Regions:
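Structured N-terminal alpha/beta-domain signature
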Residues: 1-6, 49, 67, 84
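Terminal amphipathic alpha-helical/low-complexity segments used for targeting or macromolecular assembly
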Residues: 1-33, 37-45, 80, 98, ...
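Extracellular beta-strand solenoid repeats
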Residues: 27-29, 35, 41, 47, ...
Length: 105
């Protein structure tokens, strides 16, 4: 019989990660279609539309909208930003404040 070590930290499920984000003030249009990484950092007044993937090492500023079918990875997003729809932000991407980003970035 296998047991789990007491001190081993188990990764949070997607439902738990989304609930944590909601409790921090993030708004989802269809939360069950969004996947976020455990290390994602969210500012205030963030709206995430359906079918978004936020992979590891992403920080999202205040007043940000992430539109449908966008994929973010290793990116830093400033304040007052609109991303997507269909945007792909690759590792190392830095989006300044007051920017609108379309697809294929």
């Amino acid at each position: 019989m296998k047991t789990i070590k007491k001190n081993k930290k188990l990764p949070l499920t997607q439902a738990a990660l989304r609930r944590k984000a909601i409790n921090a003030g993030v708004k989802f249009i269809a939360e069950q279609t969004v996947f976020i990484s455990e290390d994602t950092k969210f500012g205030k007044n963030v709206l995430i539309e359906p079918y978004v993937v936020i992979a590891s090492k992403v920080s999202v500023g205040n007043n940000v909208t992430i539109k449908s079918f966008s994929h973010l990875e290793g990116s830093k997003i400033g304040n007052n930003v609109v991303i997507g729809p269909y945007a792909r932000l690759r590792p190392g991407t830095k989006i300044n404040n007051d920017v609108k980003i379309g697809n294929f970035v």
